[in-house]
Protein backbone atom coordinates (compact mmCIF):
# COMPACT_ATOMS: atom_id res chain seq x y z
CA UNK A 1 0.00 0.00 0.00
CA UNK A 2 1.27 3.47 -0.89
CA UNK A 3 0.24 6.45 1.23
CA UNK A 4 0.76 10.19 0.71
CA UNK A 5 0.89 12.72 3.54
CA UNK A 6 0.82 16.51 3.71
CA UNK A 7 3.44 17.76 6.17
CA UNK A 8 3.99 21.08 7.93
CA UNK A 9 7.11 21.95 9.90
CA UNK A 10 9.14 24.71 11.47
CA UNK A 11 12.62 23.98 10.19
CA UNK A 12 14.53 26.23 12.57
CA UNK A 13 15.66 23.39 14.89
CA UNK A 14 16.58 20.95 12.12
CA UNK A 15 19.55 20.41 9.84
CA UNK A 16 17.26 20.34 6.84
CA UNK A 17 14.80 17.78 5.57
CA UNK A 18 17.13 14.93 4.65
CA UNK A 19 17.90 12.16 7.11
CA UNK A 20 21.44 12.45 8.49
CA UNK A 21 23.49 10.63 11.07
CA UNK A 22 24.11 12.37 14.40
CA UNK A 23 22.05 15.49 13.61
CA UNK A 24 18.31 16.10 13.79
CA UNK A 25 16.39 16.14 10.50
CA UNK A 26 12.70 16.46 9.64
CA UNK A 27 12.78 13.23 7.64
CA UNK A 28 14.35 11.34 10.52
CA UNK A 29 11.70 12.49 13.02
CA UNK A 30 8.85 11.71 10.62
CA UNK A 31 10.13 8.23 9.79
CA UNK A 32 10.56 7.45 13.47
CA UNK A 33 6.96 8.48 14.23
CA UNK A 34 5.53 6.59 11.24
CA UNK A 35 7.48 3.47 12.15
CA UNK A 36 5.94 3.50 15.63
CA UNK A 37 2.41 3.68 14.23
CA UNK A 38 3.08 1.07 11.53
CA UNK A 39 5.07 -1.18 13.86
CA UNK A 40 7.54 -1.67 11.01
CA UNK A 41 10.38 0.42 9.51
CA UNK A 42 9.08 3.20 7.27
CA UNK A 43 11.06 5.23 4.73
CA UNK A 44 9.55 8.35 3.16
CA UNK A 45 10.16 10.21 -0.09
CA UNK A 46 9.45 13.94 -0.29
CA UNK A 47 8.49 16.45 -2.97
CA UNK A 48 11.33 18.83 -2.14
CA UNK A 49 14.30 18.59 0.21
CA UNK A 50 14.43 21.81 2.21
CA UNK A 51 17.66 23.18 3.68
CA UNK A 52 18.49 23.81 7.33
CA UNK A 53 16.22 26.46 8.82
CA UNK A 54 13.70 26.37 5.96
CA UNK A 55 10.05 25.71 6.78
CA UNK A 56 7.13 24.02 5.02
CA UNK A 57 3.36 24.22 5.15
CA UNK A 58 2.82 22.14 2.01
CA UNK A 59 5.48 19.44 1.92
CA UNK A 60 4.22 16.17 0.40
CA UNK A 61 5.69 12.75 1.13
CA UNK A 62 4.83 9.17 0.30
CA UNK A 63 5.73 5.83 1.83
CA UNK A 64 4.88 2.18 1.37
CA UNK A 65 3.62 -0.11 4.10
CA UNK A 66 2.24 -3.61 4.47
CA UNK A 67 -0.08 -2.70 7.35
CA UNK A 68 -3.67 -1.45 7.38
CA UNK A 69 -4.42 1.58 9.54
CA UNK A 70 -7.29 4.05 9.71
CA UNK A 71 -6.60 7.52 8.33
CA UNK A 72 -6.71 8.91 11.86
CA UNK A 73 -3.72 6.71 12.75
CA UNK A 74 -1.62 8.27 9.98
CA UNK A 75 -2.61 11.81 11.00
CA UNK A 76 -3.49 12.24 14.68
CA UNK A 77 -1.73 9.03 15.66
CA UNK A 78 1.53 10.02 13.98
CA UNK A 79 1.26 13.57 15.35
CA UNK A 80 1.29 12.16 18.89
CA UNK A 81 4.79 10.81 18.22
CA UNK A 82 6.10 13.91 16.43
CA UNK A 83 7.77 16.91 18.07
CA UNK A 84 5.49 19.97 18.29
CA UNK A 85 7.15 21.71 15.34
CA UNK A 86 6.29 18.93 12.83
CA UNK A 87 2.72 17.92 11.97
CA UNK A 88 0.82 15.77 9.50
CA UNK A 89 -1.96 17.83 7.84
CA UNK A 90 -3.69 15.21 5.65
CA UNK A 91 -3.46 11.63 4.41
CA UNK A 92 -4.45 9.96 1.14
CA UNK A 93 -4.01 6.41 -0.14
CA UNK A 94 -2.53 6.71 -3.64
CA UNK A 95 -1.99 4.33 -6.54
CA UNK A 96 1.34 2.66 -7.21
CA UNK A 97 2.22 5.15 -9.94
CA UNK A 98 2.42 8.08 -7.53
CA UNK A 99 5.78 9.48 -6.41
CA UNK A 100 6.01 12.56 -4.17
CA UNK A 101 8.97 13.94 -6.10
CA UNK A 102 8.74 12.60 -9.63
CA UNK A 103 4.96 12.99 -10.03
CA UNK A 104 5.10 16.67 -9.01
CA UNK A 105 4.58 19.21 -11.79
CA UNK A 106 5.39 22.38 -9.81
CA UNK A 107 6.52 23.65 -6.41
CA UNK A 108 5.48 26.91 -4.77
CA UNK A 109 7.44 28.88 -2.18
CA UNK A 110 6.77 31.98 -0.14
CA UNK A 111 9.55 34.14 1.23
CA UNK A 112 8.33 36.24 4.18
CA UNK A 113 10.10 39.50 5.03
CA UNK A 114 9.24 41.40 8.22
CA UNK A 115 9.84 44.97 7.04
CA UNK A 116 10.03 47.05 10.20
CA UNK A 117 12.60 49.13 12.03
CA UNK A 118 12.69 46.70 14.96
CA UNK A 119 13.37 42.99 14.70
CA UNK A 120 10.70 40.52 15.86
CA UNK A 121 11.18 38.21 18.82
CA UNK A 122 8.25 35.79 18.65
CA UNK A 123 8.73 35.11 14.92
CA UNK A 124 12.50 35.50 14.94
CA UNK A 125 12.96 32.13 13.21
CA UNK A 126 9.85 32.39 11.03
CA UNK A 127 10.58 35.53 9.02
CA UNK A 128 13.54 37.44 7.64
CA UNK A 129 13.92 40.87 9.19
CA UNK A 130 14.78 43.82 6.91
CA UNK A 131 14.76 47.17 8.69
CA UNK A 132 15.11 49.56 5.73
CA UNK A 133 11.82 50.46 4.00
CA UNK A 134 11.06 48.21 1.02
CA UNK A 135 9.09 49.24 -2.07
CA UNK A 136 7.21 46.04 -2.87
CA UNK A 137 5.90 47.47 -6.15
CA UNK A 138 9.44 47.99 -7.44
CA UNK A 139 10.31 44.47 -6.33
CA UNK A 140 7.29 42.99 -8.10
CA UNK A 141 8.01 44.90 -11.31
CA UNK A 142 11.67 43.87 -11.27
CA UNK A 143 10.81 40.21 -10.68
CA UNK A 144 8.64 39.78 -13.77
CA UNK A 145 11.69 39.37 -16.03
CA UNK A 146 12.36 35.90 -14.62
CA UNK A 147 9.00 34.49 -15.75
CA UNK A 148 9.15 31.60 -18.18
CA UNK A 149 12.04 29.27 -18.93
CA UNK A 150 15.43 30.78 -18.12
CA UNK A 151 19.00 29.97 -17.17
CA UNK A 152 19.20 30.73 -13.44
CA UNK A 153 22.98 30.49 -13.06
CA UNK A 154 23.07 33.93 -11.40
CA UNK A 155 20.68 32.67 -8.71
CA UNK A 156 22.12 29.19 -8.29
CA UNK A 157 24.31 28.13 -5.37
CA UNK A 158 27.89 27.34 -6.33
CA UNK A 159 27.54 23.85 -4.80
CA UNK A 160 24.30 23.09 -6.70
CA UNK A 161 24.38 19.55 -8.10
CA UNK A 162 21.58 19.96 -10.64
CA UNK A 163 22.58 18.98 -14.18
CA UNK A 164 21.06 22.13 -15.66
CA UNK A 165 20.43 25.71 -14.44
CA UNK A 166 17.28 26.01 -16.59
CA UNK A 167 13.96 26.30 -14.78
CA UNK A 168 10.46 27.43 -15.75
CA UNK A 169 8.98 30.09 -13.44
CA UNK A 170 5.18 30.13 -13.71
CA UNK A 171 4.52 33.11 -11.48
CA UNK A 172 6.29 35.46 -9.11
CA UNK A 173 4.39 38.07 -7.11
CA UNK A 174 5.57 40.50 -4.46
CA UNK A 175 2.90 41.94 -2.17
CA UNK A 176 2.74 43.75 1.15
CA UNK A 177 0.46 42.76 4.03
CA UNK A 178 1.08 45.31 6.76
CA UNK A 179 4.70 44.90 7.83
CA UNK A 180 5.05 41.63 5.90
CA UNK A 181 6.42 41.66 2.35
CA UNK A 182 5.71 38.31 0.68
CA UNK A 183 7.56 36.98 -2.35
CA UNK A 184 5.41 34.21 -3.84
CA UNK A 185 7.05 32.11 -6.56
CA UNK A 186 6.01 28.97 -8.42
CA UNK A 187 8.16 26.95 -10.82
CA UNK A 188 8.46 23.46 -12.22
CA UNK A 189 11.52 23.02 -9.99
CA UNK A 190 14.22 25.11 -8.33
CA UNK A 191 18.01 25.06 -8.36
CA UNK A 192 19.77 25.15 -4.99
CA UNK A 193 19.17 28.43 -3.08
CA UNK A 194 17.26 29.85 -6.07
CA UNK A 195 14.43 31.44 -4.07
CA UNK A 196 16.74 32.86 -1.40
CA UNK A 197 19.11 34.27 -4.00
CA UNK A 198 16.23 35.88 -5.89
CA UNK A 199 14.89 37.29 -2.61
CA UNK A 200 18.27 38.76 -1.71
CA UNK A 201 18.52 40.60 -5.02
CA UNK A 202 14.91 41.80 -4.89
CA UNK A 203 15.51 43.31 -1.45
CA UNK A 204 18.43 45.29 -2.90
CA UNK A 205 16.02 46.69 -5.49
CA UNK A 206 13.26 47.25 -2.96
CA UNK A 207 15.42 49.40 -0.69
CA UNK A 208 16.72 51.46 -3.61
CA UNK A 209 20.28 50.15 -3.78
CA UNK A 210 19.71 48.81 -7.31
CA UNK A 211 17.58 49.79 -10.30
CA UNK A 212 14.47 47.89 -11.36
CA UNK A 213 16.25 46.50 -14.44
CA UNK A 214 19.01 44.95 -12.32
CA UNK A 215 17.23 41.59 -12.13
CA UNK A 216 17.15 41.34 -15.92
CA UNK A 217 20.83 42.23 -16.06
CA UNK A 218 21.69 39.54 -13.51
CA UNK A 219 19.70 36.94 -15.40
CA UNK A 220 21.58 37.77 -18.61
CA UNK A 221 25.01 37.79 -16.93
CA UNK A 222 24.73 34.15 -15.74
CA UNK A 223 27.20 34.92 -12.95
CA UNK A 224 26.35 34.14 -9.32
CA UNK A 225 29.03 36.55 -8.08
CA UNK A 226 27.18 39.53 -9.58
CA UNK A 227 23.93 38.98 -7.66
CA UNK A 228 23.17 39.86 -4.04
CA UNK A 229 24.02 37.71 -1.05
CA UNK A 230 21.79 34.73 -0.30
CA UNK A 231 18.84 35.77 1.87
CA UNK A 232 18.42 34.04 5.23
CA UNK A 233 16.69 30.68 5.49
CA UNK A 234 14.26 31.81 8.20
CA UNK A 235 11.83 33.49 5.82
CA UNK A 236 11.43 30.63 3.34
CA UNK A 237 8.42 28.28 3.22
CA UNK A 238 7.54 25.47 0.83
CA UNK A 239 3.79 26.14 0.67
CA UNK A 240 2.42 23.91 -2.09
CA UNK A 241 3.25 21.15 -4.56
CA UNK A 242 1.21 20.57 -7.71
CA UNK A 243 0.31 17.12 -9.04
CA UNK A 244 -1.80 15.84 -11.94
CA UNK A 245 -5.52 15.87 -11.08
CA UNK A 246 -5.69 12.09 -11.42
CA UNK A 247 -4.07 11.72 -7.98
CA UNK A 248 -6.81 13.84 -6.34
CA UNK A 249 -4.68 14.94 -3.39
CA UNK A 250 -6.28 17.08 -0.66
CA UNK A 251 -5.87 20.86 -0.68
CA UNK A 252 -4.73 22.74 2.40
CA UNK A 253 -4.34 26.41 3.29
CA UNK A 254 -0.87 27.41 2.13
CA UNK A 255 -0.06 29.82 4.95
CA UNK A 256 2.07 30.21 6.96
CA UNK A 257 -0.69 30.52 9.53
CA UNK A 258 0.27 33.97 10.82
CA UNK A 259 -0.69 35.36 7.38
CA UNK A 260 -4.23 35.74 6.04
CA UNK A 261 -5.78 32.68 4.36
CA UNK A 262 -6.73 34.60 1.21
CA UNK A 263 -3.36 35.86 0.02
CA UNK A 264 -3.10 36.50 -3.70
From Swiss-Prot:
Membership in a protein family: Belongs to the tRNA pseudouridine synthase TruA family.
Annotated binding of substrate, by residue: 109
UniProt xrefs under InterPro entries: PsdUridine_synth_cat_dom_sf, PsdUridine_synth_TruA, PsdUridine_synth_TruA_a/b_dom, PsdUridine_synth_TruA_C, TruA/RsuA/RluB/E/F_N
Protein name: tRNA pseudouridine synthase A
Active site: 51 (nucleophile)
Complex formation: Homodimer.
Species in which this protein is naturally found: Photorhabdus laumondii subsp. laumondii (strain DSM 15139 / CIP 105565 / TT01) (Photorhabdus luminescens subsp. laumondii)
Role this protein plays: Formation of pseudouridine at positions 38, 39 and 40 in the anticodon stem and loop of transfer RNAs.
GO biological process: tRNA pseudouridine synthesis
Keyword annotations from UniProtKB, A to Z: Isomerase, tRNA processing
CDD domains noted in UniProt: PseudoU_synth_EcTruA
E.C. code: 5.4.99.12
Catalytic activity reported: uridine(38/39/40) in tRNA = pseudouridine(38/39/40) in tRNA
PANTHER family documented for this protein: PSEUDOURIDYLATE SYNTHASE, TRNA PSEUDOURIDINE SYNTHASE-LIKE 1
GO molecular function, one term: RNA binding
Amino acid sequence: MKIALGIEYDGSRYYGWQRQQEVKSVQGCLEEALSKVADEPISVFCAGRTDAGVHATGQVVHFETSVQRKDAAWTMGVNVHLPPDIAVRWVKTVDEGFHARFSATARRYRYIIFNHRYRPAVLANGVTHFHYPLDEKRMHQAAQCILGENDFTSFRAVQCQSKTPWRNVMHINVNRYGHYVVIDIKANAFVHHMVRNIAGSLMEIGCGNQDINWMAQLLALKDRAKAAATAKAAGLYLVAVDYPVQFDLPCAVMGPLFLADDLI
